[in-house]
Amino acid sequence: MVSKSDQLLIVVSILEGRHFPKRPKHMLIVEAKFDGEQLATDPVDHTDQPEFATELAWEIDRKALHQHRLQRTPIKLQCFALDPSTSARETIGYIVLDLRTAQETKQAPKWYQLLSNKYTKFKSEIQISIALETDTKAPVDSFKAKGAPPRDGKVPASLSGLDPKDIVAVLNEEGGYHQIGPAGYCTDFFIMSVTIAFATQLEQLIPCTMKLPERQPEFFFYYSLLGNDVTNEPFSDLINPNFEPERASVRIRSSIEILRVYLTLHSKLQIHLCCGDQSLGSTEIPLTGLLKKGSTEINHRPVTVEGAFTLDPPNRAKQKLAPIPVELAPTVGVSVALQREGMDVQSLIELKTQNEHEPHHSKKRVLTPIKENTHTGPQSPSESPVPPHNQSPPTKDDATESEVESLLYDKDTKLNPKAISSSVPALLAKPVTTSIASEAASGQKIAVPATSHHFCFSIDLRSIHDLEVGFPINCILRYSYPFFGSAAPIMTNPPVEVRKNMEVFLPQSYCAFDFATLPHQLQDTFLRIPLLVELWHKDKMSKDLLLGIARIQLSNILSSEKTRFLGSNGEQCWRQTFSESVPIVATQGSNNRIVDLSYTVTLEDYGLVKMREIFVSDSSQGLSAVQQKPSSVPPAPCPSEIQTEPRETLEYKAALELEMWKEMQEDIFENQLKQKELAHMQALAEEWKKRDRERESLVKKKVAEYNILEGKLQKTLIDLEKREQQLAIAESELQRERRELKSERERNLQELQDSIRRAKEDCVHQVELERLKMKQLEEDKHRLQQQLNDAENKYKTLEKEFHQFKDQQSSKPEIRLQSEINLLTLEKVELERKLESATKSKLHYKQQWGRALKELARLKQREQESQMARLKKQQEELEQMRLRYLAAEEKDTVKTERQELLDIRNELNRLRQQEQKQYPDSREIASGKMDGPHGSALEEGLDDYLTRLIEERDTLMRTGVYNHEDRIISELDRQIREVLAKNNASN
């Protein structure tokens, strides 16, 4: 057991995430996998910052943690997007955590970026911390039934202060019972027993890919009864489970009400089928039916819950396996009984087995008080020590179809390595009556004649080498030689693998035979009958295959050199040894050599056999114990005695007795052979039926598994066909797009080349035109330069003439006066033209200004309406802002208009000054005519100015932007009043 301080928890805290896209119809799940165990968080919303807030923990001890750190075992976290409507999962990315970073001290969480992120535009991260914590909870066996969620149990009114969760079973070692509930209130004694009676179809729990921990595994049922671990007697055959029903009982001190509450809280009993420390399947027995509410059945008879319960493999939910058909479902027959102490116990469940129908006697196991009671099977009888070089008999587990004969011959027996036989009996020294009386007293006897020799023949198949076939073989060697006294085949074990260019030594290949025979018969047999050694290829997946046979000529040893040695009794003995290699020739096809066999044979002659009797038993083994009895040899008749008849001589009687004995032994041997044949045929038939049942159940299991695999394969094939169609469509689309892109590229390239060619041609043509233009311009330049020179010369000539003419005309006064008049007229015309132009520009400016003001007013009105519609709640503030804005704009407009008016006024003043400067001379010339028109012109100017001011004021008022309180309107009114006042004053 691991101490509590060495028990740790690897805690991975998955806190939150960031930089995830929003997918409202999906959920996020994080699965963590460590050491083959997988844990997952609860689904959370797929937002940009998902909140997981989950801790995942694995139990581990320090030794295993150290091993994992040395191996750098990772903790892999995978993030999935789950669609709740279809249960489809998409892999988003994964994170690999290093176990070596986990410490027992608290560490700050870190952000880990998802690898192979599906959201390539987002750098999704998850905040994770990993730490080691001491596992403080009590150690629980991995196969114990976990407590069901607490249910509402009602406590009696007298114990209303007792919490149902506090009701536990406490062992009282002195009293030998479990106390459930308060000791003062709960005083009734009960007996609770669990019986596992039978099991069927257990082979369905082991898939084809599962490896069992042992070559010959033992299976057993395990459950926990009030904290006591209980296992039944192990069994090794899953197909035909044969075990005695066992009942485990516990003594309980409680009351019916408290016990009912306790059974409500612990409502299920888990029973596991185990192999070693691995659970192959489990089932749950409901216990709530034992004590039903308001039932008093327990006061009269035991209450039971019994039946055949289906075993489920532990990983069915994880692997999403298909359900097993009902007729193939593995079941276990269980009976749970509860009774008051002292009540007679009857059989609670009918014991059903497949192979036998007679009732079994259940074993009873009392669990209280707790003692270390180890239930073991019956011990096998001790065997005599096996001598070295013993040929071990073939066992049942190693048997295949090719070994049926060996199995049947050696069934329930052990092969004596040194078989004793009497092949050739000599003359009998006893009369017939003595032999018959001896047989009646102690069974059948064989008298070995004194002329026979005691031989020991040993065979050692050392090795095989020089393999000629092109594939490795997994071989055993097998032979039999009935002359040595045993017809059972001798085989090497275990199988060895032989490859090319290698020599393999055979295990357990030595065997020795002790027998008695005549030397000339031994020589004759060795010359006539060779020893045939068969080479078999063993395959776990198929039937054994006979590859070839080697012929060993045993007569070769007779010609080898004899060596002398002393026997166990100090007698002189002889030994002959012979070694060689023989080829093993193929049995099928051409007789080609397969491999060479190296062997050594030894023949030891221990001399003459003394007169002995061999008792032959009727057992199926055919081997007998040897009892040696010294026989009194009758004295030889004296020669002086009278000669008797030939039929009365001892030799004749001995020969007659020998013939009769031979006939009797032949009959006995034939009867024994028939009995053995019948027994062997019966055993073979039983074995065949058993194996047929096993094969049938295995075939059913395989068919069910293959049907499931076929369904998966069909689904996979359909998916593959769809995928292939999609790939074909996508590939054709890709080819089409590739062709289009290629054609478009070629077209663009052609267009580009054409445009480049045209641009080059245009450039060349443009350069030529520019050159021609330059040439033309040069010619024009020379021509114009020539014209300019001519014009300058002409101008100089005309200027000289003009000066001369001017000098001539300047001397005349009327000419000078006329020239001045012309100059003044020209200036007047020019000033009138400028005045008209200024007036037109002023009118145009006024029109543009009016349109701009109207447009500005319209835009302001639209802006005000939109602002009023959008921002009604902020009307006052926006009104102030609008007023400020209008005031500022009005101020700017007033400034601009004032500046423009000032510019106009300055222009008018400048024009008036110019007019006043231009006309003083004309006034002096016609002073009398100028006085009257001057007053009228001034009045007309004031009227025009007044009209213009009124038009400007009315234009501004019509725009709707200004009112009478505005400064510009007030200024115009003031100027109008001043003009009116001046006009009145002049009148």
Curated annotation (Swiss-Prot):
Interacts with TACC2 and TACC3. Interacts with CCDC52. Residues 670-919 form a coiled coil. This is Centrosomal protein of 120 kDa. Plays a role in the microtubule-dependent coupling of the nucleus and the centrosome. Involved in the processes that regulate centrosome-mediated interkinetic nuclear migration (INM) of neural progenitors and for proper positioning of neurons during brain development. Also implicated in the migration and selfrenewal of neural progenitors. May play a role in centriole duplication during mitosis. Required for the recruitment of CEP295 to the proximal end of new-born centrioles at the centriolar microtubule wall during early S phase in a PLK4-dependent manner. PROSITE patterns: C2. The modification Phosphoserine is found at S936. It comes from Bos taurus. Keywords: Coiled coil, Cytoplasm, Cytoskeleton, Phosphoprotein, Repeat. InterPro entries: C2_dom (IPR000008), C2_domain_sf (IPR035892), CEP120-like (IPR039893), DUF3668 (IPR022136). The gene is CEP120. CDD domains: C2. Residues 352-408, 912-937 are annotated as: Disordered. Its main location: cytoplasm.
